[in-house]
Structures are given as structure tokens and as C-alpha cells.
Amino acid sequence: MKCYKSSSILSTNHHPFFYKQQPISSLQPTSIPTTISYPTRTRFSSTRIQSRLTHDDPVKQSEDLSFYDLLGVTESVTLPEIKQAYKQLARKYHPDVSPPDRVEEYTDRFIRVQEAYETLSDPRRRVLYDRDLSMGFSFSFSGRRQNRYDQEVVEEKSEWKAKWQTQLSGLRRRSNQKDNNTMSWAARMRRQQQESS
């Protein structure tokens, strides 16, 4: 490949892009043409259109935002500021107040804002989120997914349920013992048989 200098654009009726080139070396090759034409049609138009559509779509834009960016606050924000930002956005994107032609878009945005608020308003979940965010993990929204923060809530509820069931079974046992003291031997045997079957 040869290097050329002093390229200039020449315009004709058929092709707007012709380049007249002069070789740098003193030897002028005879096989290299002095003009090069480029097609007038480019394939970049579809890329530009796609790019513009992506940037014009606020729902697609919000998928790439962190929860802080979604609420429009900084990472050093306080809880009252998070609540205030959430209330403003919830009023703006609530499905009941959305234009009829943008209900789906507003609903998606409202759900994202709700998830951001739930995560950032809970101190434990916020610490986990901040840690993961500082490590560069991506948080793309997938709609009420079971993420790590939700999993912790589920675990807490299951622990609470296990404690509650233990207490309930203890109360039943004491109640049965109290009833057993006032029942006859035959009544206690019938009751045991019913419980075992």
C-alpha cells in the first residue's frame, strides 16, 4: 500500500466523492488509478437511527442507570432526600396520571423508581447495594426479580415464620397438657389415637 498526499475532493454529477491523489515517492506507479470513487450510499444511517431511538427512549435509558441516578440524587444523599425524590418521581410516573399513549412506559419507570426507593431507603440493603456498585457490578432492571436484597428479606421472613411456628407448637403442647390433666385416662388415649392417625 502506498501513502498519498494532497487529496482533494472533486465533485461530479454521478458521484460526489472523487479523490485525486499524488504519490509521495518520486516514482509514480502506473497501475494505481489517480482517482478513487466511494459509494454515495452509506450503511451508517441505520446505525444512527437506532442510536437515536435508543437515546430517545427514557425506559431504555433508565435500565442502565444506578438507583441513585434513577432517583436523581447523589450517593451521599440522606434518607429524607431519598423520600422526597421518590415522592416527586412517583407522582410523575404513577400509572394513574400517565398519558393514555404512554401507560406502559410510565408503569415501567414507576416500578424502577419503586425498586430504587425500596433498596436505598433500607440501610442494610443500601450498604449491600453501595458495596456491589463500588465493585462495578451492573444492575440492570428485570422487573421485581428475586435479587440478593430480596433474598435476604425472604430469609428473614422464613426465620420469623420458623420462630412463630415453634412458639405455636409450644402453646399447643401446653394446652394439650392442661387438657390432659382434666381428662380421664380413656379420653386421653382416644385423643392420642386421633392425633397419631
UniProtKB/Swiss-Prot annotation:
It is found in: Plastid, Chloroplast. Light-grown seedlings. Signal peptide: none annotated. The keyword Plastid applies. The keyword Cytoplasm does not apply. Residues 169-197 are annotated as: Disordered. InterPro entries: DnaJ_C/III_chloroplastic, DnaJ_domain, DnaJ_domain_CS, J_dom_sf. Residues 66-133 form the J domain. Disulfide bonds: none annotated. Pfam families: DnaJ (PF00226). Its main location: plastid. It comes from the Eukaryota. One of its GO terms (cellular component) is chloroplast. PROSITE patterns: DNAJ_1, DNAJ_2. Plays a continuous role in plant development probably in the structural organization of compartments. This is Chaperone protein dnaJ 20, chloroplastic. It comes from Arabidopsis thaliana.
